[in-house]
Amino acid sequence: MDILFYKVFRNLYIKNIIFKILRLYKNYSKKYNVFKNVEQYKLFKDKEYLVKMEWDMNIEIPINLIPDNTIKYLKFGKYFNQPIKSLPIGVELIDLKYSLNFNQNQFQIPITLKTLILNRDFNQNFTKLSNNNNDDDNNNLSLNKVENISFGRDYDCLIDETIFSKSITSIKLSDSFCQELDDRTLPKTLTFLEFGWTFNGYLKIGDLDGLSKLRVLKFGVSFNTEIQCNVLPNSIEKITFGSSFNQVILPNSLPRNLRILKFGSSFNQPIFPPPSSLSSESLPNLLKLKFDSSFNQPILPSSLSNSITRLEFRSTHFNQQLSISSLPKNLKYLGIFINNYSTIIEDNDNNNNSEFLKIINILN
C-alpha cells in the first residue's frame, strides 16, 4: 500500500491534480459564494467543489439543479420568499436568518440536515417538519436528523420538547423569547442552551429537570434574576451571564461540575468566604473565572475555589489588593489591567512577590 502511494504521489501530473482539488475545496470552504440568478449558478464551473453557497434571489431552487453531496452550507438571501422543497442530499446547514419569510408548511428538510437557523420574523407555533425522502413514516418525525436549531429574532411562541428530534443537542432561543419554562419545554438531549436578549424569567425548581446532558448555558443581555438552589442541572460545565446580571450568588446555587464561569459587565456583588458559592466547597471543579468591567470587590482568603487556574479582573477600576493567601492555590494565570497593577500588589506583607509576579498577565 505504501509503495503504491509513493508511486502515485511521485507522479507530478497526478500530484498537481490532487493539490489543485485540495486548493479548490479549501477556497470554497472559507466563505459563501453568492448567486443572484440561476444562470450564474449554471455557468459556475466548479460546482462540484462548492461547500458554502448563498441563494440570493427570490426564485425557488429548481429540482435537480444542485447536485447531491456537494453543498454543505446553504444560506438564503434577504429577498428569498419561496417554498423550499427540492434541496439536495448532503446539505448540513440551512441559514434562513435574513430571508423574508419562512413557511414551515412549504419546507421539506434534507435528511442530512444538522443545523437550522430560522429567519428573524418567524413567530408561529413551531410544528413538525417533514423531510424530503417521501417516506410516510419519516414524514411524521420532526427534524429527525437536526442537532442544532437557532430561532429568529422575533420568535416568542410556546415550544414543546415533542417538536424536536431525539438528536437535537443545541438550541438558541430568540431575542424576543420570554415564555415560561417547565420540564416539558426543552428536549432532554440538550448539551447547549442559549437564551436571547430579553429573557429575564424566574427559573423555578423543576423547570430544567431532565436536562442531565446540558453542558453549556448562556444567558442573554437582560437576564437579571436570582438563581435559586437546585435549579440548574449539575451536569453544566460552563455558564455565561449577560451584561445586566448583578445578583448575589447564593450558596450551592451553581452546579458543582462547573468548570468555566463568566460574569457580565454589571456584576459587582461581594464574594464571601465559605459557604460562598464560589468557594471550593461549592465549586470544587471550577477552572476559569472572569469578572467584567464593573467588578470591584475584595477577594478574601478561601472565598474562591482552589481549583481555579485562570482568573481575570477585566475592570479598569478594580483596585482591591490581592495576596497569595487570598488567591486560589492552583492559580496559574491572573489577568489585570496595567493601570491597576501598582495598586493591586503594593505593600502587602502576605505577598510572596516572586511567586505573585509569575502569574500576573497584563490585559489589553
UniProtKB/Swiss-Prot annotation:
The protein here is known as FNIP repeat-containing protein DDB_G0277323
Repeat as a keyword? yes
FNIP repeat locations: 57-98, 155-198, 214-244, 245-271, 295-340
Q: Which organism is it from?
A: Dictyostelium discoideum
Give a Pfam family name: FNIP
Keywords in UniProt for this one?
A: Repeat
- Identify the PANTHER family for this entry: FNIP REPEAT-CONTAINING PROTEIN, FNIP REPEAT-CONTAINING PROTEIN-RELATED
